Amino acid sequence: MAGRLSGVASRIMGGNGVVARSVGSSLRQRAGMGLPVGKHIVPDKPLSVNDELMWDNGTAFPEPCIDRIADTVGKYEALAWLSGGLGFFVGLGLLAVLNDKASKVPFTPRVYPYDNLRVELGGEP
């Protein structure tokens, strides 16, 4: 579509169609924006041993692929946090089960007219 439109524009402007073909082919490839991560650099010398461990996307500061951040939480501290969090939710669930009034009264209490049939059931008039 873009190639046809640029071809029509080239004929209107009096061109020979070479520009239309080059514009059409570049618009079909990535809309003329280029590569998403910059130009590919062809290595001209041997790569370093740890080259695959660096993420180099063409910016000024390549970064390591493996984050080498010091351990901030040890395994036993993480286990304590996990146990505490799960214990909190278990306690909250048990509190909800113990405080559940609907499970203690599985049906709604009946309400009768005339003061809940107090006189009819043998109460004082």
UniProtKB/Swiss-Prot annotation:
Biological role: Accessory subunit of the mitochondrial membrane respiratory chain NADH dehydrogenase (Complex I), that is believed not to be involved in catalysis. Complex I functions in the transfer of electrons from NADH to the respiratory chain. The immediate electron acceptor for the enzyme is believed to be ubiquinone.
Primary location recorded for the protein, binned into one broad class: mitochondrion
Segments crossing the lipid bilayer: 78-98
Entry's Gene Ontology cellular component terms: mitochondrial inner membrane
Keywords: Electron transport, Membrane, Mitochondrion, Mitochondrion inner membrane, Respiratory chain, Transit peptide, Transmembrane, Transmembrane helix, Transport
Record text on subunit structure and interactions: Complex I is composed of at least 49 different subunits.
First and last residues of the transit peptide: 1-29
UniProt name for this protein: NADH dehydrogenase [ubiquinone] 1 beta subcomplex subunit 8, mitochondrial
Species per Swiss-Prot/TrEMBL record: Arabidopsis thaliana (Mouse-ear cress)
Family: Belongs to the complex I NDUFB8 subunit family.
Subcellular location, record wording: Mitochondrion inner membrane
